[in-house]
Amino acid sequence: MLIPKENRKAIHQALFQQGVLVAKKDFNLPKHPEVGVPNLQVIKACQSLDSRGYLKTRYNWGWFYYTLTNEGVEYLREYLHLPAEVVPATHKRQVRPAAPRAGRPEPRERSSAADAGYRRAEKKDDGAAPGGFAPSFRGGFGRPVAA
């Protein structure tokens, strides 16, 4: 499919910025909500990149999910004339706040009286079979009883 150069560049820029792109499987959608070009052109451009191994495509519930591969990052970096320091958002490490170094919390003191009822509860025999119960199989319906 012939895609104008400015539309192809807009698709590649949006893909490189985030590292992922989502497109609804609606070929008649006039504009892709994120890129601003016809949705059919977005799908076909991503199909082209996928066939060359620069994207991975997943399809689920009427949506295409495109993710860049390492080869795709290199290709788009060359296509868009970007320096090597620029990477997609999915390839950046997220800075997480450091965990507090307070150490282990002190264990709570337990009162033996509070736990005694829980730990050593008397056995309840409500609904249990009596001690002398001996189950036996007597055959099914219409079968002779073996003695």
Swiss-Prot record:
Keywords: Cytoplasm, Ribonucleoprotein, Ribosomal protein. It is found in: Cytoplasm. There are 2 genes for eS10 in S.pombe. This is Small ribosomal subunit protein eS10B. It comes from the Eukaryota. GO terms for biological process: cytoplasmic translation. Component of the small ribosomal subunit (SSU). Mature yeast ribosomes consist of a small (40S) and a large (60S) subunit. The 40S small subunit contains 1 molecule of ribosomal RNA (18S rRNA) and at least 33 different proteins. The large 60S subunit contains 3 rRNA molecules (25S, 5.8S and 5S rRNA) and at least 46 different proteins. eS10 interacts with GCN1 (via middle region); this interaction is direct and promotes GCN2 kinase activity. Residues 103-127 have a biased composition (Basic and acidic residues). One of its GO terms (cellular component) is cytosol. It comes from Schizosaccharomyces pombe (strain 972 / ATCC 24843) (Fission yeast). One of its GO terms (molecular function) is RNA binding. The keyword rRNA processing does not apply. Pfam families: S10_plectin. Residues 90-147 are annotated as: Disordered. Belongs to the eukaryotic ribosomal protein eS10 family.
